[in-house]
Amino acid sequence: MKKTPFLTLEKAREITAQIPTPFHIYDEAGIRANARALKEAFSWNRGYREYFAVKATPNPYILKILNEEGCGCDCASYTELVLAEAVGITGHDVMFSSNVTPELDMKKAVEMGAYINLDDSTHVEFLERVAEGKVPQTVCLRYNPGGSFSLGNTIMDMPRDAKYGMTEDQMAGAINRLMKLGTKHFGIHAFLASNTTTNEYYPELAANLFRLAVRLRNATGAHIAFVNLSGGIGVDYRPEQPCCDIRIIGEGVRQRYEQILVPQGMDDISIFTELGRFMLAPYGHLVSTVLHQKHIYREYVGLDACAADLMRPAMYGAYHHITVLGKEDAILDHVYDVTGGLCENNDKFAIERSLPEIDIGDILVIHDTGAHGHSMGYNYNGKLRSAEVLLKQDGSFQLIRRAETPADYFATFDCTEFRFNV
C-alpha cells in the first residue's frame, strides 16, 4: 500500500518561501477527522473521554484543536500541566499520570483539580501531604499485573520488567486508605504494550481491567468510576503494515464491557483513553531539504534535518517512510542512506532505502512524525530545534512554534560572565 503525503510540492514551496526547512508540519483536517472517528467508536459509552498524551506533541495549538474535538489532556509533568492550563484545559479535563513524581508537580495537579493517577501505593500518603489532608474525591490507580502480557501465543510486552504501577494487593490497600481519607470514587489504569497494530490489544486489555475492577469493588466496596485504557494503539509506519481499525477496536471493548461489567451492575463505569501516537503520528511530517550527496561505499543523501529533529530512527531503529516531493510516482531505482549532520553514525533516517533518484535541493517528507517527533528533539552538537507549522483546514498555514535560534541555545548561560556574539 502506498503512503501519500498530505503535503504537495507546490504547497511545500509556498511554505518554504517563508519558513525554511527543516520543520514539522501538522494536518489539521486529518487530526480533527481522526478525533471524531475515535469519539464515534466509543460513543456507546456515555462517559467516554480521550485524554491526549501531551508528551507526544506538546504544542498549545494542537491541544486546542483536540480540546475543540472533546479531548482532554494526559499530563506527566509540571510543564505539561502548565501547557494544558494555558490552553484553558483544567480540572477533570486533565489526567495527571506521573511516576517518580516531584512535589511541585503533584501540587500543581492538585491545584488544577486534575484527576490524579497514582503510580505507587506509597503515593497515597504523598498525595495526602501535598493536598494538606484534603485528598481528591476521585483518585485513579495504575495497575501492573506482572508476568508477561500476551495476545494468543504472542507475547506483546513484559509488565514484570516495567517500573510502572502497583500490584493488585497494593491497589486494594491504597483504595482502603484513600477511602478513610475521604476519597469516594476510583479509576483504574494500565499501559501494557506500545504501538500495537492489532485490533485485539485494547479489547484484551479492557477485559483484564474490567475483571480487576470487579475484584477490587468486591474486595473493598469502592465505587469504580472509570477504567483508563491508556495508550498503546499504534500506526502503520510501513506501507505494508496492517492498520488498526478504531471501529473494530471500540466494538471489541463494548463487547467485553457488556460481558463483564454489566452483569455485575457496574454499567456506570466510564471508559477513558490516553492516546498520543494514534491521535497525531500520521498527521505530521518532517519536511527537509537535501543539502549534499556523498558517493563512497554507499550512496548518501544528507539533509538539513537530523536526529535532533526526529530521534526515533536513531534511538529505536524505527522505520519512517520517505517521499521525495514531486517524484511520488518515479521509479524507486536508487538505494540511499538518508542522513543528518550529527557527529553520530546512527543519525540516519533511512538505511539502504529504495528511493527515486534524488537531487540536491529536493524536498523530502518524512512521514508519521506527528507524535514523538518534535517533542523528542534535543540540542546535541549545538543543533537547534526546528519550527512547527500547522496546515489549516482551509489550505492556509500558520507558524505555531518558531525554530530555535543561537540566542535561545545560549540563553541559560545568562548566569555566567560569558557573552556570546550571535
Please give the residue ranges for each predicted region.
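Conserved, mostly hydrophobic/aromatic
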Residues: 31, 55, 77, 109, ...
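Glycine-rich, aromatic-flanked loop segments that form ligand/cofactor-binding clefts
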Residues: 134-148
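A charged N-terminal "starter" segment
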Residues: 1-137, 172, 180, 184, ...
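Active-site loop/helix belt of alpha/beta enzymes
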Residues: 145-291, 355
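Flexible loop/turn segments at secondary-structure boundaries
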Residues: 58-61, 83, 102, 148-149, ...
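Structured core elements
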Residues: 72, 95, 117, 140-142, ...
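Short acidic, glycine/serine/threonine-rich loops at helix termini
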Residues: 63, 86, 106-110, 127-130, ...
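Charged (often Lys/Glu-rich) extended helix/loop segments that serve as interaction or gating elements
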Residues: 9, 261, 266-422
